[in-house]
A protein has these predicted regions:
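Fungal secretory targeting signals
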Residues: 1-20
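Functionally critical loop-and-helix segments that line ligand-binding/catalytic clefts
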Residues: 21-38, 176-233
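Substrate-binding cleft of extracellular glycoside hydrolase catalytic domains
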Residues: 21-153
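Hydrophobic anchor at the start of a short beta-strand
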Residues: 82, 156-158, 183
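Glycine-rich, charge-decorated loop segments at or immediately adjacent to ligand/cofactor-binding or catalytic sites
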Residues: 94-97, 168-176
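Structural recognition of alpha->loop->beta junctions
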Residues: 103-119, 124-126, 172-201
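Short, solvent-exposed loop/turn segments at secondary-structure junctions
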Residues: 126-129, 166-170
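Aromatic-lined carbohydrate-recognition surfaces of secreted/lumenal glycan-active proteins
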Residues: 154-169
């Protein structure tokens, strides 16, 4: 995923059906975008087989993606299941503060069957210390603070987007989130080799950093019916 300054490599978690270590020959196509993509042909993406999109909403407690509203409206009009994501800055403010900011600017969830739970994009710091100056235990506490705040306001835990490498390096490969937080795993390869943190499988797989209609390519680990069920909660 792209921050305001850099490209990231992350995503995965949740409720799915396939073996995460097996080569994927099926699943549901989707993609993730931010203001870097500008105008997006959502109807074209839907016609080509995409059924969901994850859209950047916020970053830290000061940044709102300029195209979030238009992207969200366009995705809705095209019939795509959609949701927002928040790029974390654990060195900037508390998890609770950032979850509150995310919720105030498009990151909410409703059980309409068309809205994904919000996603926490947590990855290497594009501007400084790779783990934002936090120890593994401090990082786990920060993520929990974000997630519990989000859950208290929506009734859903957020999805967590990351890479296996970052998760191991910056959380000590914590298993604390593997039960309630769906994993969006970034791993650019023909198949998934490592699922971190005790998650039995990824819910979504960011399998490439480009997609025909913009942004990164993502695959839901299941069929269309299970994707709709996941969105509805």
């Amino acid at each position: 995923m792209k921050t305001t300054t850099a490209v990231s490599l992350l995503l995965s978690a949740g409720i799915a059906t396939a073996n995460p270590l097996a080569p994927r020959s099926s699943g549901v196509q989707g993609f993730d975008i931010s203001s870097y993509q500008g105008t997006v042909d959502f109807s074209g993406a839907y016609s080509s087989g995409a059924r969901f999109v994850i859209i950047k909403a916020t970053e830290g407690t000061t940044y709102i993606d300029a195209d979030f509203s238009s992207h969200y409206e366009g995705a809705t009009s095209a019939g795509l299941i959609r949701g927002g994501y928040h790029f974390a800055h654990p060195d900037d403010s508390s998890g609770a503060d950032q979850a509150t900011y995310f919720l105030a600017h498009g990151g909410g969830w409703t059980n309409d069957g068309q809205t994904l739970p919000g996603m926490l994009d947590i990855e290497y710091n594009p501007d400084g210390s790779e783990c934002y100056g936090l120890s593994a235990s401090e990082m786990v506490s920060w993520i929990s603070d974000f997630g519990e705040t989000y859950n208290s306001k929506t009734g859903r835990y957020p999805m967590i987007y990351s890479t296996a490498d970052w998760w191991s390096t910056c959380t000590g490969d914590s298993t604390e989130f593997s039960t309630n937080y769906p994993l969006v795993l970034a791993q650019y390869a023909s198949s998934i080799s490592t699922v971190p943190g005790g998650w039995p499988y990824q819910s979504f797989w960011q399998n490439a950093d480009s997609y025909t209609y913009g942004g990164d390519s993502d695959i839901w680990n299941g069929d269309s019916a299970s994707l709709s069920k996941f969105a509805k909660g």
